[in-house]
Regions:
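Membrane-proximal, proline-rich intrinsically disordered regions
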Residues: 4, 20-70
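Conserved, well-structured interaction surfaces
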Residues: 86-159, 189-191
Length: 198
């Protein structure tokens, strides 16, 4: 009798588990919008454009892009500006005492802006924005292209050799012209390739 109950329980468990679909695995996040659904109309494109510019401006702390850091990268390191007091935002750049914690700020923040610009460019190329005039869409598209070029130019000036050092043959930074997947690891392009893209 015990064998019959065990067999019935086992068969019932197998049947109940096999009848479940996998749709419960395909839930959309409750606290965000999937990137492919984020830009579907003109207002979404305007919001994405604002987010792109917000990434450039930053929040005026020591890790911001144009809110603070980008000015320091060139001017402080070239002795055009001096940090007179220890602890000032520019002192670490002036002394060139970078730590492992500085790398994400100098690399990730600009590439985050490129990601935002690429998402906007992709949505417009895929004709997701249809409720605006061609001129309105073209303006946003052009702004995203300019921002992407500006950020690539900034990055190659920080991480690449000057173009005149070897006619652009040395390694620069990865040129990213489409949204990347989470595990993509793009290789570095030459300085000349970055300048050509810009």
């Amino acid at each position: 009798m015990k064998k019959i109950y065990k067999s019935i329980t086992l068969v019932a468990a197998i049947l109940s588990l096999s009848s479940c679909g996998n749709d419960w695995l395909d839930r959309k996040p409750a606290d965000g919008i999937p990137s492919e659904d984020a830009i579907t109309n003109y207002n979404d494109a305007l919001t994405a454009r604002t987010g792109m510019y917000d990434g450039i401006q930053g929040n005026s702390n020591a890790t911001s892009y144009y809110g603070a850091r980008m000015f320091y990268y060139g001017d402080v390191r070239a002795d055009d500006m001096q940090a007179r007091t220890q602890g000032m935002r520019s002192s670490s750049c002036y002394e060139m005492l970078y730590t492992v914690d500085d790398a994400p700020n100098m690399w990730n923040i600009p590439y985050n802006v490129i990601r935002r610009a690429n998402r906007l460019i992709e949505a417009i190329n895929e004709k997701k924005v249809t409720d605006a005039t061609e001129a309105q869409i073209g303006k946003i598209y052009s702004e995203a292209l300019v921002v992407r070029a500006l950020v690539h130019f900034d990055l190659v000036r920080i991480y690449g050799m000057p173009y005149t050092a070897d006619n652009g043959a040395s390694l620069g930074v990865p040129v990213i012209v489409k949204p990347l997947e989470r595990n993509d690891l793009p290789s570095r392009n030459t300085v000349a390739e970055v300048y050509t893209q810009v």
